[in-house]
Amino acid sequence: MNGIAYEVAFWNNVYRWKWTFDGMMNWSKYGGVITLEGFDANAFLIKTDNPKVLDVGCGMSYATGNHIMRDGRLMPLDIRYIDPLAAYFNRIMARHRRKMPEIEFGMAEYLSAFYPSHDISLVVIQNALDHSANPMKSIYESIDVLKKGGCLYLNHHINEAETEHYKGFHQYNICREDGKLIIWNKNERHDVAELTAGFAELTVG
């Protein structure tokens, strides 16, 4: 809970001023093809009819893009923006009259309570899993809502809790060790591949 005030104040300041909002939108992929670092999301999604995407813990950046390119045509993508602070974020957008998609309330740790099982093509979590109250449960829940052959895409700063001295939402670290994806803090340590073996394949970039 300690991080809520900081997050709300940060995004309010971004949306409040034209120059900060325009600066964010200049690097955002919103309005264009979905773009994820190290993963060709468009190529993955066009293999599926009517793909669905969840951007979980999205904040207010709209960074990933909301279209796919299929047969040379730019087509709208069914993408849902999800964050536990949705009520705060939607009020910020309304206050500053920004015309962006509404953010839906949802929590990674309980994703299957908000969305049907085996229905989603791609779940995106960027710089948010380490803010979760239970990162491994968030991974399990994300896998539960994915279709067979679906993808959970994770992209995070390395060991952010250590960098931020465990302040606010920064309670877990994520890193790569000997090719393994590890989630850890001072009290626990998890090898993600080991805990998802048998029902998920893991690629660490």
Describe the function of each predicted region.
Residues 1-48:
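Class I SAM-dependent methyltransferase Rossmann-like catalytic core
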Residues 54-111:
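Class I SAM-dependent methyltransferase SAM/SAH-binding core
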Residues 153-181:
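Conserved class I S-adenosyl-L-methionine
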Residues 174-205:
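A SAM-dependent methyltransferase catalytic signature shared across enzymes that methylate proteins
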